[in-house]
């Protein structure tokens, strides 16, 4: 996520329970440790944070794999980070391992909850939910399940008018991006927005992160790199960094696209 106050990009190193900051002036530095596994939740895997976002007040909100929660960072620039858990249960059961998030204009958080942060995935003894869902949370209401029929919900984005939600399904047997109508009480009219199953047979990677550009073009990390898709799901082209790409985001002015590719943070000039 781009952080204007730091004039830099924050990104997660999931398996090492760390988050890093990169700025033009200072380069790379460790920003958070631990980033997502603080022994808050029962877990036999030590993954850290995954998806990151800023709320309307500039607070850092984290999808924490290890702690199985959506949390807020309460102290910037301190040696030991302190987190406030926003949501970690649904109907009295632990979430799986929140993966990615997006905010709507009212400040609600939509987030995905696949089992990647559990050592044995769907078969893990600590998994309490019998599905991998997409949820909506806000400070004004209880967490709400909006979609439960995807096998591996991952990256998530909203259309510019917030009437459509896009969710990546990172499943090697069903590598697609789904689109849903956004209603007050959940998602409806689920349909395949883009089918990547043929591409993923010849290109490395599955659909993962999604980012909506102000032009309405969706930047989707997936087979071969970062796919550019228009609002009708037409594949406009692919940015191919040569490595499996996990996530991407823009800087404040959308001059650059930043992407995390295996062991590399890269950027591509857009304008």
Tell where the protein language model's regions lie, with residue ranges.
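Sequence-structural signature of mature extracellular/luminal beta-sheet repeat domains
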Residues: 1-271
């Amino acid at each position: 996520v781009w952080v204007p106050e730091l004039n830099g990009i924050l990104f997660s190193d999931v398996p090492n329970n760390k988050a890093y900051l990169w700025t033009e002036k200072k380069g790379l530095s460790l920003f958070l440790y631990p980033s997502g596994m603080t022994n808050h939740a029962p877990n036999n895997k030590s993954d850290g944070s995954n998806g990151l976002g800023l709320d309307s007040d500039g607070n850092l909100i984290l999808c924490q794999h290890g702690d199985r929660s959506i949390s807020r960072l309460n102290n910037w620039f301190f040696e030991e980070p302190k987190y406030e858990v926003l949501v970690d249960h649904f109907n009295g059961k632990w979430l799986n391992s929140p993966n990615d998030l997006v905010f709507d204009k009212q400040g609600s958080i939509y987030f995905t909850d696949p089992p990647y942060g559990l050592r044995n995935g769907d078969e893990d003894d600590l998994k309490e939910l019998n599905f991998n869902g997409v949820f909506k949370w806000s400070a004004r209401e209880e967490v709400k399940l909006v979609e439960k029929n995807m096998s591996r919900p991952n990256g998530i984005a909203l259309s510019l008018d917030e009437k459509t939600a896009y969710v990546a399904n990172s499943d090697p047997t069903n590598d697609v991006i789904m689109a849903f109508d956004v209603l007050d009480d959940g998602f409806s009219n689920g349909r395949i927005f883009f089918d990547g199953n043929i591409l993923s047979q010849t290109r490395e990677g599955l659909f993962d992160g999604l980012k909506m550009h102000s032009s309405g073009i969706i930047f989707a990390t997936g087979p071969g790199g970062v796919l550019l898709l228009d609002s009708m799901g037409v594949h406009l082209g692919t940015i191919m960094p040569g490595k499996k790409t996990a996530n991407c985001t823009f800087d404040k002015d959308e001059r650059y696209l930043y992407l995390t590719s295996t062991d590399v943070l890269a950027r591509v000039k857009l304008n």
